[in-house]
Amino acid sequence: MPADKKQRKGAHPYRKPRPNPSDPSSSDKPARPKPTHRIPATEARDGAGIPGLSKLKSSIRQTKRLLAKENLEPGLRVSTQRRLTSLEADLAAAERREVERKNGAKYHKVKFFERQKLVRLIKRFKRKLLDSETSSKKRSKHEEELLDARIMLNYVLHYPNTQKYISLFPSNPNQTEDEDDDDDSSKPKLKLPPLLHPVPSTEECEKMDKPTKRRYDLLLETKRLMEESKLKSEPETDLKKGQVDGVVVGLGADVQIGLGDKKEAKQNAAQGTGEEEDDFFESGDE
């Protein structure tokens, strides 16, 4: 006798029912917790709240297409023109931020090693000044070297990330970072680069190439800012507090120090992602 249709549709008496995914109580395993946060889009991951380059360029194109219409209402045209001006300003800020990000990542290692060298030199000069047997002539020399080392440390800490970094130390593979002050040591000791003293003459300044001249101008500008108390006179103390590279203390991150031509500074910021040779490799050795 054939089985009843209702009995066929019912559950098998010896088969365990399958859990219903819509009913969490029907499953033996604990339900996976749902994520409580959403990953924001790439354009929204900016601390300044500025969208990404692609989104800004797309918005500018759409705004220009809207302004190209002839039958646009006067009020809407004015508001659209204002929006275009705001978008172009945001695009310039985003491009600048991208240049700063790339240069910061590119020269981070170079700045780190030069910062470590300068901190070692500062400790060495401090130790020599504490020596009571040091003569007055040597003491004045050590004070001068200590000041120059601090100027160079501020140079490294506050170098604008919109520009290509110009190295302070020559790329000498045989030079060590040994702090030993023994003059009889066979290994070459770490020495402070003679970039500020002796002071170069006018003829020597005229013979400098462009990267060397720009580095010297930046060092003089850094010294002036230290004299005006806009930069720390003892920058080595800020390293313990997590000093951020590329930030000009007291003036803001948009200040271009040591550059006389503003147009050249804007071109350097706009062309920061170009493929020209880096100034670091042009003037690494002196």
Swiss-Prot record:
Q: Where in the cell is it found?
A: Nucleus, Nucleolus
- Ranges for region Disordered: 1-57, 167-213, 259-286
Q: Which UniProt keywords apply?
A: Coiled coil, Nucleus, rRNA processing
Coiled coil regions in record: 53-103
Answer yes or no on keyword Nucleotidyltransferase.
Answer: no
- Cellular component GO terms, alphabetical: nucleolus; preribosome, small subunit precursor
Q: Where is the composition biased (Acidic residues)?
A: 274-286
Q: Specify one Pfam family.
A: Efg1
Query: Which spans does this entry mark as compositional bias, Basic and acidic residues?
Result: 204-213
Q: Which cysteines are joined by disulfide bonds?
A: none
The GO annotation for biological process reads: maturation of SSU-rRNA from tricistronic rRNA transcript (SSU-rRNA, 5.8S rRNA, LSU-rRNA)
Note whether Nucleus occurs among the keywords: yes
Top-level lineage group: Eukaryota
User: Which segments show compositional bias classed as Basic residues?
Assistant: 1-18
* Family to which the UniProt record says this protein belongs: Belongs to the EFG1 family.
Q: What does this protein do?
A: Involved in rRNA processing.
Q: What is this protein called?
A: rRNA-processing protein EFG1
Q: Which organism is it from?
A: Cryptococcus neoformans var. neoformans serotype D (strain B-3501A)
